[in-house]
Each structure stands twice: as C-alpha cells, then as structure tokens.
From Swiss-Prot:
Keywords: Aminoacyl-tRNA synthetase, ATP-binding, Cytoplasm, Ligase, Nucleotide-binding, Protein biosynthesis. Its main location: cytoplasm. Belongs to the class-I aminoacyl-tRNA synthetase family. This is Arginine--tRNA ligase. It is found in: Cytoplasm. NCBIfam families: argS. Gene3D superfamilies: Arginyl tRNA synthetase N-terminal domain, HUPs, Isoleucyl-tRNA Synthetase, Domain 1. A motif ('HIGH' region) lies at residues 123-133. It comes from Haloarcula marismortui (strain ATCC 43049 / DSM 3752 / JCM 8966 / VKM B-1809) (Halobacterium marismortui). It catalyses: tRNA(Arg) + L-arginine + ATP = L-arginyl-tRNA(Arg) + AMP + diphosphate. Its EC number is 6.1.1.19. It comes from the Archaea.
Length: 579
C-alpha cells in the first residue's frame, strides 16, 4: 500500500500547489524520521519560501490547509511540523496492507513490458572461480533478481572470453601435455582437472627453454590467427577446452546460486562478421588514427587511446565487446553490466565509442564493485593454490553446521534428522556469505569476517533467516487457516502498527532498488523488518492472545514470513523453515 499512498500524496500535493498558484515540479516527498508519526512528508515549503516571500513553516501550513484529507483513501490527516507537511496513514492503509502482505507474491510489481539483460561474472574460463571474484556473481545475480521482482523481463548473461591469448595458451597446453605428467587435481571437477594444463603451460612460457618457448608461442599465435580467420577446426579445438572448464565453473556458481540464461561467446561476433563490420565503421570515425602499429580511437576525454585493431589484423577484446554491446542494444530495451572497479576506464571508453557509433548509450548502465578481502588466517587453504570460491563455501557450511548444532535444544534436535541439519547448514552458511557481500554498497571494499557473517544476534543473514524460521514455527503450531480478509481492529498496539508500516514498505523498496541498481538496500530492509518483528514478538503474544487478537496477529506473522521470504529471495538467499 505504500506505493498507492505515495501516488495519492503526490496527486494531492500537486493539486494543492496548483490551487495556491505555486510550481509543482519538485514535490520534495520523503520518508520522515522514525519519531514522526507520518508515513510520508514533504519539504517543498523550503523550496517555495523564497518565491512566496514568507517563512517555510507558514508555507507548509498553507499547503496543508489546501489538502482535503477527507477526500483521500490512504491518508487520514495532513499536519505540519515546522517546515514539513506530514501525511498520516488511514485505517484503510493498514487494513489493505494486512490483507496484501499474506499474498504469496507480495513485493512483486506489475509487468513493465521492458526487457533487460544483466551481464555479470564473465570470468575467463581458465580454471576455478577465485574468491576475489565472488562479489561479481553475487551482486549481478541480486541485481537481476531485484529487476525481475520489479516487473522487468530479465535475461542473465555470462560473456565468455574464448578468443583471447589466455584461451589460446590453454588450448595449446591441453593439446600438448600428458595428464600423467600433471599433479593430482585439487577437486574432482572439470575446471580443477583442466587448470593443471593451463598452469603447466604458463610455467613453460615463463621459464622454459628458449626453443621450447618459441615453438609454443608460434602455436599460440596460430590458434589466435585461426580464430580471427574463421577457421572451424580452430573454433572446435578452443570450444572443447572452454566448454569443459565453463561446465565446472557453472557448478560452483550454481552453489551461490548464480544461474545464467545464456553464455554468449566472444567468437560469436567474429564468426558472424559483426567484428569485421565494426572495425570498418571504427576506421571511418574522425578520431580513428593509425599509431604505434595499431588502429586506435583518439578519444578527447581520455588520456589513453582505445586500441581496436592490431597491425597483424587481429581484433582485441574491446573490439569484440563493442559488437557484443550493439547486439545487446538490438535485442533488449536495457543492458546492465556488473564490473570490477579496475574495469572502469575500459567501460567508459567503450561507452564513448558506442556513442560515436550512434548507439543510444542511455540503454546501458554499469554497476561497479570493489574487492572482497579475507582476514589473515581467515581460511584454511591448500598451499600454493590460493582460495577458490568452493573453498569459501565449504568452510561456510562447516562453520554454519557447528553454529546450528550448538544452538539446538533437545526438542528441536528431536525434530531434525541429519539431512535436515545438512540442509540448514547449507542454507545458513551459503546465505551468510551471500548476504554479507550483497548487503554492502558495491563500491566499498569489504573484508569478509566469519564472526560477523554467522552472528545470529547481529545484522546478518542468520539473524534475518531466524525470524523467518520463527514465523514458520508459530504458524506451524496453529491448526486454523489465516483468514482471507483479516480483521485490523484488534491490532492497536504500537508494535503492531509499526510492523504493518514496515511490511507496507517492501514493494517501494524493490522499486527503488531496481531503479538505482542497489540490491544492498533490500538487505537493509530485511534487517529493519527483522528488528521490527522482534519488537512485536517481545511485546505482543500471539498464540496466547484472545481469539480475535490471535487471528489478527497470526496474519501479521504470516505477512512477515511472506515478506522476509520474498525479500531474501530477491537477494538470492534461502529462507529456512527451521533453524
């Protein structure tokens, strides 16, 4: 109901300003501080005071007097507090909120008939997913989920670098070395088995005999040239390596979970001629220059030129990515790319080049993120191999299992078997990792800390998940169904009304997170909702209340369960039914 109330306030405020012959372009609507009883407030009096020639509180009073609250559905009264115009909620606002929050799809917005492609992760298929890159799939998947909740038609893409030097080295190494000469894989999974070839190949290229290195480099260059020339046999050789490694990486990413609708390969835009066509168009631009044995764009706003073609006629990653983006613009209404902060220059140059090629770059938005660090000694890892995402997730599950088992009382333990405990440990452990990462502003660097991520008493995934499990436990103890139209009248306690207000905000939180591409604000909302529910739970007995109050409070519990489940789902975090 929050969105409906906001729309009603916008219309009423605009009409009042028009009546007073005042401009209504900027209404200054905002959520007031917690100690103000209003749901929404307007600071428009600040803006208009100079034009009217009187103090802001006087302007606010005139505006409030021009609004007939009796004609509104979701607003009961319009008051002022200094320069602010406050809009108080009506009983209809609370009643319709109580009814809507128990619907399973609460928080999902109407279809916008707008297609969006979200490209994220796109790590080179050269081995296991490293923990340092874990923020990309977590943020990217959450952005896609929030957009989906907001009514967009979303596709999730992984852009596969299958045409660069690293892949050519990998292909040469895979075809050259005997598996018997390689160390045992760290895990029985395709990417762990294949990366052994890649590591040995790089060792040879860095430290090998000069003649051996020269022969290897010639083969690597031959593979790159074969891709550029459209040689089908070369494509097949490369695809065998890429697809095998990518299959294993998918399994790891699926644990988060981060799933994809399509894996779009760079070579697609070489094979279909798009890259060659793009190169011809780039050469025709006024800022195109041939310098230092390469074709480049001398972009006026950048100190560094954008190289798009080497002297030997081979294209670069950025060249193929330009063709990739033009394909996205032709296929989708909007395109979102999630990138590490070290790619910002490349992304800005790409956008500038796309604009020079007459593309509408308003279709394109980027989400940049900083890195995830682990505290010294924070992980047990294999010597010399670094920390892979699988390592982090395994340890998260192990630590979560210890925490869950330590919190089980005799009654709960008797209700759960080992499979249940394994399930809860996975939900809590992986949820803790994902939530801890997605809950931070992407541009801020973070250090992942186990104690914080798995703290059941603090602002963490387990804290929010536990509220969902508690709601499920309460509802599991009753045999009657929640009424389709629960009665609001018994809900008069401040904690009950506070909980209704918080629940009502969820659709607006989704809308804002989708507009701004900020899923971390949904995580903030889940913590606020969990805290508000806990205050309600402490002060308002549910099962021991009189029948009418019990039924109404059960509806509140059911609404909280639904809202937390959907909010966590929008973040890609599971909501356990027991913990």
């Amino acid at each position: 109901m929050f969105l409906q109330l906001r729309a009603e306030v916008e219309d009423a405020l605009a009409d009042a300003l028009t009546t007073l012959d005042l401009p209504a372009e900027d209404l200054g609507i905002e959520e007031p501080p917690e100690d103000v009883d209003a749901v929404l407030a307007s600071s428009v009096a600040f803006r208009l005071a100079g034009e009217v020639g009187t103090a802001p509180p006087n302007v606010a009073s005139d505006i409030a007097d021009a609004i007939a609250a009796d004609d509104l559905t979701y607003v009961s009264d319009v008051t002022t507090q200094g320069p602010y115009v406050n809009f108080l909620p009506s009983e209809a606002y609370f009643a319709e909120t109580l009814q809507s929050v128990t619907e399973s799809g609460f928080g999902r917005l109407p279809d916008r008939d707008t297609s969006v492609v979200v490209e994220h992760t796109s790590a080179n298929p050269t081995g296991p997913v490293h923990v340092g890159r874990a923020r990309n799939p977590i943020i990217g998947d959450a952005v896609a989920r929030v957009l989906d909740y907001a009514g967009y038609d979303v596709d999730r893409h992984y852009y596969v670098n299958d045409a660069g030097r690293q892949i050519a080295v990998f292909t040469w190494a895979y075809e050259t070395f005997d598996e018997d000469d390689l160390p045992e894989p760290e895990r029985e999974s395709p990417e762990y088995e294949m990366v052994r070839y890649y590591r040995k190949g790089n060792t040879i290229l860095e430290d090998g005999d000069p003649d051996e290195v020269e022969a290897a480099e010639a083969e690597v260059q031959s593979i790159l040239q074969g891709l550029e020339d459209g040689d089908e046999e070369t494509y097949e050789r490369v695809a065998e390596v890429v697809d095998t490694v990518l299959g294993g990486m998918q399994n790891t990413l699926g644990r988060l979970p981060a799933e994809f609708d399509e894996f779009v390969k760079e070579t697609k835009f070489m094979r279909n001629g798009d890259t060659d066509d793009l190169v011809d168009r780039l050469k025709g631009l006024d800022c195109a220059v041939y310098e230092e044995d390469a074709w480049q764009l001398d972009l006026p706003d950048f100190e560094k030129n954008l190289v798009f073609l080497r002297s030997d006629g081979t294209s670069l990653y950025t060249t193929r990515d330009l063709a990739h983006h033009e394909w996205k613009f032709d296929t989708y209404d909007r395109a979102v790319t999630v990138l590490g902060e070290d790619h910002k220059l490349q992304a800005d140059q790409l956008a500038a080049a796309l604009e020079l090629l007459d593309n509408d770059t308003d279709q394109l938005r980027q989400v940049f993120y900083s890195w995830v660090n682990l505290p010294e000694g924070g992980m047990s890892t294999r010597e010399g191999t670094g920390i892979d995402l699988d390592d982090l997730l395994d340890e998260a599950i192990d630590r979560a299992r210890e925490e869950v088992e330590s919190r089980l009382d005799d009654r709960t333990r008797g209700d759960l078997d080992e499979d249940d405990i394994d399930r809860i440990a996975r939900q809590v452990g992986i949820g803790a990792v994902r939530y801890d990462i997605v809950s931070k502003q992407p541009t801020k660097g973070i250090t992942f800390e186990w104690d914080r991520a798995l703290d059941f008493e603090a602002q963490s995934a387990p804290y929010v998940q536990y509220v969902h499990a508690r709601c499920c436990g309460i509802l599991g103890d009753v045999e009657t169904d929640i009424p389709d139209e629960p009665d609001l009248d018994p809900l008069s306690e401040p904690e009950e009304r506070d909980l209704l207000r918080e629940l009502a905000r969820f659709p607006a939180v989704i809308e804002a997170a989708a507009d701004d591409l900020t899923p971390h604000t949904v995580a903030t909302y889940t913590r606020d909702l969990a805290e508000t529910f806990n205050a309600f739970y402490r002060e308002c007995p549910v099962l021991d209340a009189d029948p009418e109050t019990r039924a109404a409070r059960l509806a509140l519990v059911d609404g909280t369960r639904t809202t937390i489940a959907n909010a966590l789902d929008a973040l890609g975090v599971e909501a356990p039914t027991s913990m």
